[in-house]
Amino acid sequence: MLTERVSKYIKKQGLVSAGDEILLAVSGGPDSVCMLYIMHKLSREMGFSLRLAHLNHGLRAEESDRDAAYVTELASALGLPLCQQKVSVKAYQAEHHLSLEEAAREMRYAFLCRTAAEFGSAAVAVGHTLDDNIETVMLHLVRGSGTRGLQGLRPVLNRTIAGAGCLRVIRPLLCLGRAETQVYCREAGLLPRQDITNLSTEPLRNRIRLEVLPLLKTINPAFEETILRTAFIAGEEMALLDEVTSQMKAELVIRQDDVLMIEKIEMQRLHPALKRNLLRQMMEELLGGLKDIEARHIENIVQTMDKPAGRRIDLPYKLVFQVDYEHYLLGWGIDELCPYPPCQGEYRLGVGTETFLDGWVVKTEILPSPIGLDLSESSLVAYLDMDKAGTDLIVRTRAEGDQFQPLGMEDAKSLKEFMIDNKIPRNWRARVPLLISSKEILWLVGYRIGESAKVDENTRRVLRVEFRLLG
């Protein structure tokens, strides 16, 4: 019996607790009407209460109004409270430049979220079935998806709705097929509404349901079971990955206003799968969801991680990812954050000592041989030819007319030009420390050493210089 199957599924998935009020999203179609009557019966057995919600999208003129009237009749017949609203999806679509399907979904979930918040509902129940799950997996495959998309619809979804809040969505009918809900309604003498737009092959989801799936079942009659099994396995794997990632995020990610920060060394240690998932969770925290965030955005961030400090990329919703000296930054207002403390005046460095500057400690030491040195140890460590660099060392920031001959270049260029070419943010440039000899710039700290003091096969002594941030 369907009611017993749904009851077992609800208990297994922990969808409802005694004392909860559940807001049922009822469109008037077979799936939502079946859900309404099954949940109404179970509410008495399991000790939860119900409230109905119906959004009239205004897309089918009088038919939409008849849908609303039918839901009103159902609520009255069962003695359940009903919240209704009529909206213009097409006006919203034009204003926000969305597809009709996207506009309807956004308005529907915003309405459900506001209604649930107004009445203190524990969750919103929607009537998605096994067939919806199969169609969703296929839709993700067609559009391009990783493992996350293969998991399809989940029994529980915590969804953040822009401008409306957070919504807990449950799907108690994911254990039933669409044909079963139709039979239930017929045997119960119910006459649910039929949406003729579901017969159109214009929307991609409809085309998959009406054309692609029937064809695939001629190739493999058990195709639907195969898809559902794949979705289950993908869901189990993603649940584990999300749990591990959440723990890492709590340990590694720091939030400062609208900017999330993580140490570069910690991020670089992570497996690529964890790295990508952590980025998704960071973006989800900032944006309240992952709408318009695609795999290519995540990959662009991953590729940018190997770039020098100051490199940045722009993301949807004016979100910015930027490489810092010791951190990766993701958020808004990053331009106002500078990793360099102010460095006023000039500081003379000793050799073989530690020197404390404004916000920095600089350690210098002489090494006997360049053999075996890791010259790419850190962007805040430089190895120089001691005899070429000399001992008359000064640290200061840029000055008007500074010239710099970067490693690998035959001629010097203006320091300003080098900073622009290397995409050093404008608000950083006046704070970047320079290591200066009596004649020239030896090192633009964090970026490039100069050509004149590079370590080569003739080097006898190596000067190691390390900058460390204080605090």
Swiss-Prot record:
Localisation per UniProt entry: Cytoplasm
Gene Ontology annotations of biological process type: tRNA modification
Database matches in InterPro entries: Lysidine-tRNA-synth_C (IPR012796), Rossmann-like_a/b/a_fold (IPR014729), TilS/TtcA_N (IPR011063), tRNA_Ile_lys_synt (IPR012094), tRNA_Ile_lys_synt_N (IPR012795), tRNA_Ile_lys_synt_subst-bd (IPR015262)
Predominant subcellular localization, coarse grouping: cytoplasm
GO CC terms: cytoplasm
Catalysed reactions, semicolon-separated: cytidine(34) in tRNA(Ile2) + L-lysine + ATP = lysidine(34) in tRNA(Ile2) + AMP + diphosphate + H(+)
Entry EC number(s): 6.3.4.19
CDD domains, sorted: TilS_N
Domain notes: The N-terminal region contains the highly conserved SGGXDS motif, predicted to be a P-loop motif involved in ATP binding.
Function text: Ligates lysine onto the cytidine present at position 34 of the AUA codon-specific tRNA(Ile) that contains the anticodon CAU, in an ATP-dependent manner. Cytidine is converted to lysidine, thus changing the amino acid specificity of the tRNA from methionine to isoleucine.
Protein name: tRNA(Ile)-lysidine synthase
Gene coding for it: tilS
